[in-house]
Amino acid sequence: MSQNLILILNCGSSSLKFAILDPINGDEKLSGLAESFYLDDARIKWKFNGEKGNADLDAGAAHTEALNFIVSNILTDELKQSIGAIGHRIVHGGEKFTSSVVITDEVVKGIEEVIQFAPLHNPAHLIGIQEAFRIFPELKDRNVAVFDTAFHTTMPEQAYLYALPYSLYKDHGVRRYGAHGTSHYFVSREAARRLNVAEDKVNVITCHLGNGGSVSAIRHGECIDTSMGLTPLEGLVMGTRSGDIDPAIIFYMHDTLGMSVEEINNTLTKKSGLLGLTEVTSDCRYAEDNYETDDAARRAMEVYCYRLAKYIGSYMAVIGERLDAIVFTGGIGENSAHVREITLNHLKLFGYQVDDARNLAARFGNEGVITAEGSPLAMVIATNEELVIAQDTARLTITK
């Protein structure tokens, strides 16, 4: 049997997403999620050949145990033998990695060197890499790292530098790196294809909206600015993350309120955003469903969309020429007609007019243009980060 399928591993701090794809046609053979690592209720669920399955993992199980379960209990011998390479999603590659690379000892060292910028994710990615080497030794030279930061490495200095002492950047790498790059890359290319614009000519603003969220300005096919910064805390209002705040708030929380550094970090990353504004949940669907009847839900939705519209408007200025489309993607971007409507209503100055029927239709797997005839284009495109990872992995290994 030919080895032409790609195993994709996305190791989070307490979870593991996995999939097996055909990199040519995107056909998904297997997908799944193991979660609640290190807890008593660690579990795994998957979909294989159209059939769903789930199981409890041993209490305290983590990445190693989950991968062992996948190989021993889910993968058939035939499917194992068809895996030709392994692609790893890596959240942070720093300045060193500007594109996907075959994993070597030097690459592992490079991922380790930027752990401080992704302290929850990069260590988990390294575990996934080592476990892949152990479980599939015959594929050791066919493991590929695909970096979420790579697409943003085309940002110019004026976009990625903070107005801090330059030595913080020069000596410590303190700058804006962005995130969700694989998603922004995919939907920008897909927008170019659908609009019949060359990839190196397309100008789009891409909005990846999920529990985390970011916006990117893409000019001539390259990212020239993005809303996330040194870490994924900067930028938009998110599920539990504050996004942009006055940095002096941190000093106020510490000096006046007596909060520790750990408490402040926990507040900004896990207790803010939609959760902080609603005081109920980080789920955007709650704010959407209760928008008309609950003041907190309305408040959360308005702040969320206002911040998003501000970024989109500023990126119109940054692109500075013809804008082909605003693209919404991610769980919220693809499914929340309300978020899209409120956001685009802030942009009426630029001629944007939502078509209600189109906007409502573009949900739950449906895509397309959501603005009215004669309006500048805004559209929904479903992201497919796994396909990008599979294609990059195949390009660097199987088809090289």
Swiss-Prot record:
GO terms for molecular function: acetate kinase activity; ATP binding; magnesium ion binding. Pathway: Metabolic intermediate biosynthesis; acetyl-CoA biosynthesis; acetyl-CoA from acetate: step 1/2. GO terms for biological process: acetate metabolic process; acetyl-CoA biosynthetic process. Mg(2+) binds at N10, E385. This is Acetate kinase. The keyword Nucleotide-binding applies. The record marks H180, R241 as: Transition state stabilizer. Gene3D superfamilies: 3.30.420.40. GO terms for cellular component: cytosol. Its main location: cytoplasm. Keywords: ATP-binding, Cytoplasm, Kinase, Magnesium, Metal-binding, Nucleotide-binding, Transferase. Substrate binds at R89. It comes from Haemophilus ducreyi (strain 35000HP / ATCC 700724). Mg(2+). Can also accept Mn(2+). It catalyses: acetate + ATP = acetyl phosphate + ADP.
